Structure formats: C-alpha cells, structure tokens
C-alpha cells in the first residue's frame, strides 16, 4: 500500500514520523510531505529519512502548492492528511477522483468533560493554555 502522509506546520516531525513508523511496521512504502512553512523540519526529514531508511520504499517530498497538487493527482492506495479544513477539502476531492480512501485529521474538535465539582476558573485556564 503506497500512501502519502501530508503533515502540518505546527508539529512537522512528530506528525510525519508517527504514521511513517506505522507504514514501516506494516511493510508499506510511504511518502512524507511536511509543510513548506516548517522548512527546517522538512529539510531535516529530507536529509535523515533516505539516510536511515530504504530510499526505494520511503521518501520525503518538499514543496508548496504546485508540488502538492501534482502529488494529489497521482493514484495512491491511501492518503493521510493532517491540517486545516480548507486544504482537507482539496485532499478529499483529489482522493475522490481515484476513489482513494483517505483519512483527514482536521483538528478543531477538542472535547472536554467537566464534572460538577470542577473548579471552573482552573479548568478554563487549563483548557485555554493546555
């Protein structure tokens, strides 16, 4: 199963490598596409992944909209995207053209359960600031 993993700018290494580890464990080739906004992380991944992993099975691609658009036009077995809703819609539409299954992690939903006896001021601060 060949799949690209499109990662966001805010956690480019962790969110790139987590799915890559799963692909390696399953014996699946994968392409990692870190965000162009996090250029230093993208460059580090570009240097390190081919150095330590089979370059015939695992690759890193860097670039912005033209490179991503091209990659989305290709036939994949599965597409994994982490990022915003606007680009998520573009990824889903591209996947639909080839009836490619995809997983979109679009954030924005952070459910919190607050018990009746919770200190609301403290809970609000922790929810807001992590």
Residue ranges and their predicted role:
Residues 1-52, 99:
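Conserved small-residue-rich beta-alpha loop and adjacent elements
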Residues 21, 78-82:
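Periplasmic-binding protein-like
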Residues 27, 58, 79, 108:
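Residue-level signal for inorganic ion chemistry
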Residues 28, 33-35, 62, 82-83, ...:
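Short beta->alpha connector loops at strand-helix junctions that form conserved
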């Amino acid at each position: 199963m060949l799949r690209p993993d499109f990662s966001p700018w805010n956690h480019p290494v962790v969110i790139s490598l987590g799915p890559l580890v799963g692909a390696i464990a399953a014996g699946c080739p994968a392409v990692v596409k870190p965000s162009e906004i996090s250029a230093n992380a993208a460059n580090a991944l570009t240097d390190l992944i081919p150095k330590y992993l089979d370059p015939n099975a695992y690759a890193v691609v860097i670039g912005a909209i033209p490179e991503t658009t091209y990659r989305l036009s290709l036939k994949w077995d599965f597409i994994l995207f982490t990022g915003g809703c606007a680009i998520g819609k573009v990824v889903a539409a591209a996947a639909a053209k080839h009836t490619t299954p995809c997983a979109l992690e679009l954030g924005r939903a952070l459910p919190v359960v607050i018990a009746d006896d919770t200190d609301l001021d403290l809970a609000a601060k922790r929810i807001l600031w992590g």
